[in-house]
Amino acid sequence: MKKILIAITFIVSLLSGILWLRHSRLEKRDSEARKALMEVYELETAYKAMFSHYTDNIYAIVYIQDTLVTEGGNANYLVSLDEATDSTFKATAVSVVDFDGDGQFSQWQVNETGNIIEIVED
């Protein structure tokens, strides 16, 4: 009986460790998307201060996309400016990797308020 309890305790500890590692990896990827979108938000805010409107041209705000993992780099997210007006903008970070193999690709979005939300969960 004692050996069974030790085995069960070991298995539970092992599973807890696996779940913690998975959660830790997901948090790291999520923070990558949030960091990239916060940079876009700051660049768009500076652009608007200079030109009195937002832009949908990612090169105009001088955002430099890190090299994607699909191209031999380390970035898991492709950032794009989806729309912009005088008073609003929307930017998206879409994962280029299906992290859990379910066919869904993580998508995060930021707007002119700086509010970053996950719009598609992977």
Please state what every model-predicted region is.
Residues 6-17:
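Hydrophobic membrane-insertion alpha-helices, especially the h-region
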Residues 1-4:
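Positively charged n-region of N-terminal signal peptides that target proteins for export
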Residues 15-65:
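Conserved hydrophobic/amphipathic alpha-helical signal-anchor segments
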Residues 49-122:
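Periplasmic/extracellular, small/polar-rich flexible segments of pilin-like filament-forming proteins
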